[in-house]
Structure formats: C-alpha cells, structure tokens
C-alpha cells in the first residue's frame, strides 16, 4: 500500500473513492489541499495495474478558495467510462454547498463539464438558490445500472447535527 502524494489532511478530513472499469482500469478520486488546513481540490488518478499511477489531475473548479469534498466514483459499462460526484462550496460561502457530477469516457483524459445536481433552491429549510447549508458527505453514493443509467443519492442539512435530508437523482 502506498500513500498518495499531496493527500494531506485538511479541515474536511481525507476521503477517497475507487472504481474499476470493465477492462480492469482503476480510478481513484480524492480531495487534497496544497497545505494542511487549506481549501481542498478534487483530484483523480488512474492505473492499469494498481502499481503505477498517473499524475494527479484536478477535476474540480480550479479555485484556491473552494472546499471540495466527499467523492463518489462509479464505473460505467465500457472501458474508460467513469462517473464522479462530489460536494463543494463554489457558490460563495460555506453555507452554499452543492453536489456536482462529471463523466469521462476515456479513462480520465477528458471530462464533461461539471453538472450541478443539487439545483433545487427549495424543498427544505436549509436550501437556497446558492445551495445547501451543510454537506453530509459520508452519505453520498453513485451507481451505474445495467442500462448505463447513473444513480446518485446524497445527504445535506442544516448542520452536522441535523436536521437534514436525502436527495436522489438519475440520468445519463
């Protein structure tokens, strides 16, 4: 087992996701800061054998002031098809978290534009047009069914003590 360089602990603590595609290609997603306690970006790395890994590639929005956390990763039906979800506060404050989605069809060389999944500004007292107050990132999952449909569920709420809710969406 090897430590991933650049995966220093920040405020949100480390979290990582792993998926293996139909050809055995391995991808990991994780968040890391440039220094301990700094806002963290979302990165991916991939490997054909689990022994050698590509350099990390940033897949979040590139800002040094945005917190990114809690990745979820799933493999699609074809080699190189991976789907990534995570939560970040790019909409301006720590009370404006959202759940984001990106997809690659070529093993991570290129990615779709980030799609905001948590785009409902109502339905709960902790939601605004900008996002939700607090991410329950340890309650985030992504799966791909036999037809290639992506399914995502996540938790969000008012604070780490609640109340909160679970939200679900699906799509290609």
Question: Whereabouts are the PLM-identified features?
Answer:
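Extracellular, repeat-based ectodomains that mediate carbohydrate processing or recognition
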Residues: 1-172
């Amino acid at each position: 087992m090897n430590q991933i360089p650049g995966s220093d602990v920040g405020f949100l603590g480390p979290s990582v996701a792993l998926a293996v595609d139909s050809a055995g290609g391995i991808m990991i997603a994780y968040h890391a800061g440039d220094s301990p306690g700094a806002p963290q970006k979302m990165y991916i790395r991939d490997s054909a054998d689990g022994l050698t890994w590509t350099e990390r590639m940033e897949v979040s929005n590139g800002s040094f002031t945005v917190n990114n956390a809690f990745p979820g990763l799933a493999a699609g039906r074809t080699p190189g098809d991976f789907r990534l979800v995570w939560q970040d506060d790019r909409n301006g404050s720590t009370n404006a978290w959202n759940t984001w989605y990106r997809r690659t069809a070529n093993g991570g060389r290129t990615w779709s534009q980030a799609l905001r999944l948590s785009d409902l500004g109502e339905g709960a007292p902790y939601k605004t047009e900008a996002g939700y107050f607090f991410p329950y990132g340890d309650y985030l999952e992504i799966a791909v069914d036999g037809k290639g449909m992506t399914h995502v569920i996540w938790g969000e709420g008012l604070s780490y003590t609640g109340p909160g809710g679970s939200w679900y969406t699906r799509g290609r």
